[in-house]
Design a protein with these regions (language model features):
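Pyridoxal 5′-phosphate
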Residues: 1-421
Length: 421
């Protein structure tokens, strides 16, 4: 394969892309040369939908014109504004609308879920996590363990790849569950790992955990909006995710949470950290002293959600509904496969792709461990308008996103690498 061959293939693929028009619905940053950048960083922060500004401004105008009455007299009343998101989020994560809610931020939601679902006993107090869990997850988990009077060093069990592999296999996680079942209170895994890009089998891990009465929860920060999910059918107990990566809600925007209906509608409500926005909607404003949770995931809400953050998220979710996860996933597999083909074919000595090669075991991201002059290659990419990110000590992450990336973006990335290697 040559660069010329790659350009020809990319041109053909872009011409035949049935989702190409969606790119025009996003604000693409410009490079210093005036051209669009090749933005391969949607795994860190998604781009702004062109409609986001107008959607936020509509709510600003409503605030200016209505004041507090916007909660009830607005065309989209603020008191129920978050309910607009349930159907969209349910489709994206594979849930019932009442099993999902947009609220808080990811780590806050994780704390709320751990408060309700991590119920250690003297015998079963350990938590199984993945080898490269995002640090905030480990911080939250360790603090929850300490609050229960246990030692995190003893209570956290880490699933690590086999010596010959850099990624974690689902079967290895299942084997650890079987081995430590009598000690485990919770399995907490990433749907897609932020560092390696590896994807685990949520259904298989949940089934293995439930065989032994172990709770199964998931961090979907790098999975929601990236890969198809079926949380309800897979019987996951809970899940949390952010909306600022693949779901394009803006930096630090409101996050998402899933609670399976068997918990959200249990006859005896699960213990939780409670707040007034999770109280029964029909009696919330009676300001009674006793908490009555809304059935479903909404019952874990604390305060009324940040309205402007929600407004910025809505246009992206509408684009997901328009495109459909199946079509987006098909394009995603094609983009990432094209990127991998180019990297392996043109630069076999440049670096090691540590993300699994099988499409079913990854999302859109490729993580490349660069074997020499890694930082120089990264600096060259960014300097030439290829926006990606760096993870210590030597990994470059590239994530072509089907909503707004073209195959031509991958060609630009490869062209820069050909000059920098």
């Amino acid at each position: 394969m040559t660069l010329a061959d790659l350009r020809t293939q990319a041109d053909e693929l872009d011409r035949n892309d049935s989702l190409a028009h969606l790119r025009d619905r996003f604000c693409i940053p410009r490079h210093t040369d005036g051209a669009d950048v090749a933005y391969l960083c949607g795994n860190s922060l998604g781009l702004a939908p062109t409609a986001a500004r107008e959607c936020v401004e509509q709510e600003l105008v409503a605030w200016e014109q209505l004041g507090v009455e916007g909660h009830f007299k607005h065309e989209r009343p603020w008191v129920s504004f978050h309910e607009l998101f349930a159907k969209h989020l349910a489709e994206i994560v594979g849930a019932k609308p009442y099993e999902v809610v947009a609220m808080n931020t990811l780590t806050v939601n994780l704390h709320l879920m751990l408060t309700s679902f991590y119920r250690p006993t003297h015998e079963r107090f350990k938590v199984l996590v993945g080898h490269a869990a995002f640090p905030s997850d480990r911080y939250a988990l360790a603090s929850q363990i300490e609050l229960r009077g246990h030692n995190p060093e003893e209570a956290i069990l880490t699933a690590k790849p086999l010596a010959a592999s850099r990624v974690l296999r689902t079967e290895d996680v299942v084997a650890l569950i079987e081995q430590h079942a009598s000690e485990l209170a919770l399995v907490l895994m990433d749907g897609v790992n932020y560092y390696t890009g590896e994807r685990i089998d949520i259904a298989a891990i949940t089934e293995a955990a439930h065989r032994h009465g172990i709770v199964a929860g998931f961090d979907l920060a790098h999975a929601a909006g990236n890969v198809p999910l079926a949380l309800h059918d897979w019987n996951a107990d809970f899940a949390v995710w952010c909306h600022y990566k693949y779901l394009n809600g803006g930096p630090g925007c409101v996050a998402g949470c899933f609670v399976h209906e068997r918990h959200g509608f249990a006859r005896e409500p699960r213990a939780r950290m409670a707040g007034w926005w999770g109280h029964d909607k029909h009696s919330r404003f009676k300001m009674g002293p006793d908490f009555e949770p809304i059935p479903g995931a909404e019952g874990w809400q604390l305060s009324n959600p940040p309205l402007f953050s929600l407004a910025a998220l809505l246009p992206s979710l509408e684009l997901f509904a328009e495109a459909g996860m199946d079509r987006l996933r098909a394009k995603s597999e094609a983009l990432t496969g094209f990127l991998e083909l180019a990297i392996r074919g043109l630069f076999p000595e440049w670096g090691e792709v540590i993300t699994p090669a099988e499409p079913a075991r990854r999302g859109c991201q490729l993580s490349i461990r660069v074997t020499r002059d890694a930082k120089r290659a990264f600096v060259a990419l960014v300097a030439n308008g290829v926006i990606c990110d760096w993870r210590e000590p030597d990994v470059i992450r590239l994530a072509p996103v089907p909503l707004y990336n073209r195959f031509a973006d991958i060609v630009r990335c490869v062209e820069v690498l050909s000059c920098a290697k």
